[in-house]
Amino acid sequence: MIIVFMKILRSIITYFNVLLFFLILIFFLFPFYLVCKIFLIERYVVRLSFIMMRACIKISLWLAGIKIIVTGSENIPKKSNVIIMGNHIAAMDPLIFIYTFACPFVILAKHSLLRIPFVNIVLIVMGVIFVNRRSIRSAAAAEVKAIKVMREGRSIGIFPEGTRNRGGDTRVFKKGSIKMALKTGTSILPVTLYNTNNFFIKNIIFNSGLSVYIHVHPLIDVLKLSEYEKENLTSIIRDQIVKKLETIKI
């Protein structure tokens, strides 16, 4: 009973911290973002938002008593931009990406998130690129935006499955992200996530004591790949991620 009470207490404190962050972002940074967008300098606000979000995530996870175990951090490049590509288990996955990678990057997310009040404002201020996969025009526009970001020297975070697998089998990776990497010559950083679907008890109470795992694989330089490797790169990356996932589960 005491353990349950402590988890509830931790959750309340954590939610208060998140609420404070939302208020700062919505009432201060969002208006500032709109002004900067007029002068085409919104990327500086996006960078600041990323830094604030990362700090909020780190503090919140500490308050909630959730441990993030990162392996392979030596594979994270210090300067060059990359496409961070991982398996998609749960809604918390993008937050774990932000927790792990200190250098600001742009996330590709599904268009339906724009319908969630307040969350949509946070995502907009963070420069998220929204994709409606049911619309060819929307997908093409998102690809153009992502390529522009990469050619500006910034990184992209993406989940090639396109939707959450909720801890089940890793879905087949879509080829769009691979095509963007090959088109721009941007290196790919594969990432394996595990246990992100167990963040909450009854969908609201933080699961204190939980350990979440993220493994960063060696960087893939697409410019050095053979034609065969380029043709099969989607399967190669998925197999690499799934293989690591199986060893973590043991």
From Swiss-Prot:
Reaction catalysed by this enzyme: a 1-acyl-sn-glycero-3-phosphate + an acyl-CoA = a 1,2-diacyl-sn-glycero-3-phosphate + CoA
Pfam name, any one: Acyltransferase
UniProt entry tagged with the keyword Ribonucleoprotein: no
UniProt GO molecular function: 1-acylglycerol-3-phosphate O-acyltransferase activity
Metabolic or biological pathway, per its Swiss-Prot or TrEMBL entry: Phospholipid metabolism; CDP-diacylglycerol biosynthesis; CDP-diacylglycerol from sn-glycerol 3-phosphate: step 2/3
Motif HXXXXD motif, chain ranges: 88-93
EC number: 2.3.1.51
Record's GO cellular component terms: membrane
Alphabetical keyword list: Acyltransferase, Lipid biosynthesis, Lipid metabolism, Phospholipid biosynthesis, Phospholipid metabolism, Transferase
GO biological processes: CDP-diacylglycerol biosynthetic process; phosphatidic acid biosynthetic process
SUPFAM superfamilies, alphabetized: Glycerol-3-phosphate (1)-acyltransferase
Enzyme class: transferase
PANTHER family: 1-ACYL-SN-GLYCEROL-3-PHOSPHATE ACYLTRANSFERASE, 1-ACYL-SN-GLYCEROL-3-PHOSPHATE ACYLTRANSFERASE-RELATED
Family: Belongs to the 1-acyl-sn-glycerol-3-phosphate acyltransferase family.
Free-text note regarding domains: The HXXXXD motif is essential for acyltransferase activity and may constitute the binding site for the phosphate moiety of the glycerol-3-phosphate.
UniProt function note: Converts lysophosphatidic acid (LPA) into phosphatidic acid by incorporating acyl moiety at the 2 position.
Name of the protein in its database record: 1-acyl-sn-glycerol-3-phosphate acyltransferase
Protein species of origin: Borreliella burgdorferi (strain ATCC 35210 / DSM 4680 / CIP 102532 / B31)
Lineage: Bacteria, Pseudomonadati, Spirochaetota, Spirochaetia, Spirochaetales
